[in-house]
């Protein structure tokens, strides 16, 4: 019997690379241990933060197998098994399930912009090939695929998906889907800038950059909203997180120059946790000119920053 989907915060674990793009999997275990010690409820290997787009299929399998072995059931694992190809997505999904994944995170086929009906068939075929829940990674800005609420509800009714990571700045859609399914379809806030509103609407959890970068701070916010129902405390915690979010997403929202969200994330993790290395090109490391600002923001959130 598959495990139910999780409630809480989910960190998208990073993939450590060395020179020339070689995997450095010895670094992955300490990173996963740190995330769990920080209090995350789930981990998603090979989400966006895992740089799956930079990896060959066999390397993705190595990361999934290593992560699942190291996590060893301590938290829920939402394995990222996305690929443009339905065939390869099924291959990766079956591999993840066979190695103990609790659920799957799958972004719609990207770049070629298939029609909504083709995207829905993609998910149906994957669901037929596995017996664990699928979390549909709804990310319009990065996939150019916009499944409307009716499409998502249809997939849920057909049991093709069990959850949605909503990575669009539309907290009202989180509310709409939760109301339409009596909160039975798990909906996760998937973009940091609207996570507060999404959690207040009743989202089951939060999967995004902040839970992956400063998990303890993200968990405190989730608990304040979802468990304690203490909005005064939640607003205070959100206000403390906001400057880090602004730094992390300045280039993402402007589509211009500035700190890339992933450069900021890896730099932060190197400052406060086990070393994880730099992003794979074309994403460059965080500029030295921003590292002092980032270090101060992390200290303001209660983290000890390594010199």
Predicted segments, located by residue:
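Catalytic alpha/beta core domains of metabolic enzymes, predominantly
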Residues: 128-129, 140-250
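Alpha-helical structural signal in soluble globular domains
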Residues: 38, 62, 66-71, 95, ...
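Glycine- and other small-residue-rich loops at beta-strand/loop junctions that grip anionic moieties
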Residues: 81-82, 108, 112, 137, ...
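C-terminal alpha-helical cap/extension of soluble enzyme domains
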Residues: 5, 10-14, 38, 203, ...
């Amino acid at each position: 019997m598959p495990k139910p989907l999780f409630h809480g915060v989910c960190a998208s674990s990073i993939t450590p690379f060395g020179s020339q793009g070689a995997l450095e999997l010895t670094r992955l275990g300490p990173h996963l241990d740190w995330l769990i010690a920080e209090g995350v409820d789930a981990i998603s290997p090979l989400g966006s933060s895992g740089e799956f787009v930079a990896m060959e299929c066999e390397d993705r399998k190595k990361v999934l197998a290593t992560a699942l072995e190291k996590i060893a059931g301590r938290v829920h694992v939402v394995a990222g098994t996305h690929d443009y190809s339905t065939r390869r997505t099924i291959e990766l999904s079956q591999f993840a399930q066979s190695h103990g994944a609790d659920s799957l995170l799958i972004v719609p086929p990207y770049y070629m912009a298939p029609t909504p009906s083709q995207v829905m068939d993609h998910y149906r075929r994957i669901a037929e090939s596995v017996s664990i829940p699928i979390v549909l990674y709804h990310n319009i800005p990065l996939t150019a695929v916009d499944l409307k609420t009716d499409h998502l509800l249809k997939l849920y009714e057909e049991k093709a998906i069990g959850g949605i990571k909503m990575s669009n700045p539309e907290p009202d859609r989180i509310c709409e889907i939760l109301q339409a399914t009596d909160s039975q379809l798990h909906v996760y806030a998937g973009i940091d800038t609207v996570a507060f509103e999404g959690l207040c609407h009743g989202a089951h959890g939060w999967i995004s950059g902040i839970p992956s970068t400063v998990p303890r701070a993200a968990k405190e916010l989730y608990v304040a909203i979802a468990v304690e129902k203490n909005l005064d405390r939640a607003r205070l915690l959100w206000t403390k997180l906001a400057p880090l979010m602004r730094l992390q997403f300045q280039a993402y929202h402007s589509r211009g120059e500035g700190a890339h969200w992933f450069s900021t994330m890896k730099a932060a993790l190197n400052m406060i946790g086990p070393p994880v290395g730099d992003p794979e090109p074309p994403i460059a490391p965080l500029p030295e000119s921003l590292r002092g600002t980032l270090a101060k923001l992390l200290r303001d959130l209660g983290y000890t920053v390594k010199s």
